C-alpha cells in the first residue's frame, strides 16, 4: 500500500495474524486494526504475520538478518484470528475478514497482502464485495494461491478482476508441489525455503504460498514508489507483462488473459522486480542472464471451513 513518493514512506499492509512490533528489521505504520475484536490496536496471535512482513519489507543494509523486497516499507498490521488449540481463540467470521479488507482500503492502504484462504470452492460474497470495494479505492489486493496443490480456492478465486493471485516456485524454478493452480492463478514467486523475520526478534526459514504472495506485494510497492500516480490496472499489467517464463512449462493463449502467454501451473510466469521497476522508470541496462536456475535469486493456509495459512 504505497503512499507518497519514497520507499521509506510507502505504506504496506498484510492481512493475517499481526506483526511482532519490536523486531529491529521491521517498520510498522502507526495505524493498525484487530478485525477479531473490531478495535485498535491489532493483537499478536501467533507468528505468521511477522514471517510474511519480513518478506515484504525487512530493512536492507543494516547489518542485520535479511532484506525484504521493498526494504523500509511500513507495514499496517491487521489481526485476523483463527482456531488454534494452543492459543484457544475462536476463529474470525467472514465479516471480520471483510471488515479487515475495508479497514485497510479506508486507511491509506494501496497494497493488501492476503496470505490466507478458505478451504472451499463456494464464493464468499461478503469478502468478495470487500475485495471489489478495495480495488475500487485504488488498492492492489494480493492473495496466496493456497498450499493444497489443487485449484485456487476462495476468496482468491472469487473476484478475479480485483485480485492478484500468487503461486510458489522452488529454487530450481519449478512449481512447488503444494502450490495452488488453475484458472485463477496470475503469477508465481519464490515460496520454498525463504528466510524471514520471526516473533523472537530473530529469523527463520519457511515455505508456502504465504511467502510467495509478499514477494509480489513488495514489487507492487516498488512500482508505486517509482510512480505513485500509476493506476491499479497499469500496475497489474506491469507485474504480469514483465514476468519470466520458467520451469519448462508450455504457455498458451487464453482469451481471458490479455498480458501474454499463460500457463495454469505458473500463470504468466515468475515475477521480475528489476523488469517491473524498469518498465516504470524508463530504459535501463540489460539485466544479467541468470539462466533457469533460481539458486542465484535470493530474496529478494488458516482452514474456518478449514481456514488455513498458505
Q: What are the language-model segments listed below?
A:
Residues 4-9, 68-71, 104-107, 134-137, ...:
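Extracellular/periplasmic catalytic domains that process cell-envelope and extracellular macromolecules
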Residues 9-11, 22, 31, 48-51, ...:
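Residues that flank catalytic or metal-binding motifs in active/ligand-binding sites
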Residues 53-57, 76-83, 110-114, 140, ...:
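Hydrolase catalytic cores
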Amino acid at each position: 500500500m504505497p503512499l507518497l513518493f519514497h520507499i521509506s514512506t510507502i505504506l504496506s499492509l498484510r492481512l493475517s495474524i499481526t506483526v511482532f512490533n519490536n523486531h529491529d528489521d521491521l517498520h510498522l505504520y502507526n495505524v493498525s486494526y484487530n478485525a477479531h475484536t473490531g478495535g485498535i490496536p491489532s493483537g499478536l496471535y501467533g507468528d505468521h504475520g511477522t514471517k510474511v512482513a519480513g518478506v515484504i519489507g525487512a530493512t536492507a543494509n543494516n547489518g542485520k538478518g535479511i532484506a525484504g523486497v521493498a526494504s523500509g516499507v511500513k507495514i499496517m498490521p491487521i489481526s485476523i484470528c483463527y482456531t488454534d488449540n494452543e492459543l484457544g481463540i475462536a476463529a474470525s467470521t467472514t465479516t471480520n475478514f471483510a471488515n479487515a479488507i475495508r479497514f485497510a482500503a479506508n486507511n491509506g492502504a494501496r497494497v493488501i497482502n492476503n496470505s490466507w484462504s478458505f478451504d472451499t470452492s463456494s464464493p464468499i460474497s461478503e469478502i468478495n464485495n470487500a475485495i471489489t470495494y478495495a480495488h475500487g479505492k485504488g488498492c492492489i489486493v494480493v492473495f496466496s494461491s493456497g498450499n493444497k496443490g489443487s485449484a485456487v480456492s476462495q476468496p482468491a478465486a472469487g473476484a478475479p478482476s480485483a485480485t492478484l493471485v500468487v503461486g510458489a516456485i522452488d529454487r530450481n524454478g519449478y512449481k512447488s508441489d503444494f502450490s495452488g493452480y488453475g484458472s485463477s492463478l496470475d503469477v508465481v514467486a519464490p515460496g520454498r525455503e525463504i528466510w524471514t523475520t520471526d516473533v523472537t526478534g530473530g529469523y527463520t526459514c519457511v515455505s508456502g504460498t504465504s511467502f510467495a504472495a509478499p514477494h509480489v506485494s513488495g514489487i507492487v510497492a516498488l512500482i508505486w514508489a517509482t510512480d505513485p500516480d500509476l493506476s491499479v490496472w497499469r500496475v497489474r499489467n506491469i507485474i504480469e507483462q514483465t514476468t519470466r517464463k520458467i520451469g519448462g512449462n508450455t504457455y498458451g493463449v487464453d482469451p481471458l488473459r490479455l498480458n501474454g502467454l499463460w500457463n495454469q501451473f505458473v500463470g504468466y510466469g515468475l515475477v521480475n522486480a528489476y523488469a517491473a521497476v524498469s518498465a516504470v522508470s524508463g530504459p535501463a541496462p540489460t539485466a544479467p542472464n541468470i539462466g533457469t536456475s533460481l539458486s542465484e535469486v535470493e530474496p529478494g493456509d488458516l482452514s474456518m471451513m478449514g481456514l488455513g495459512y498458505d
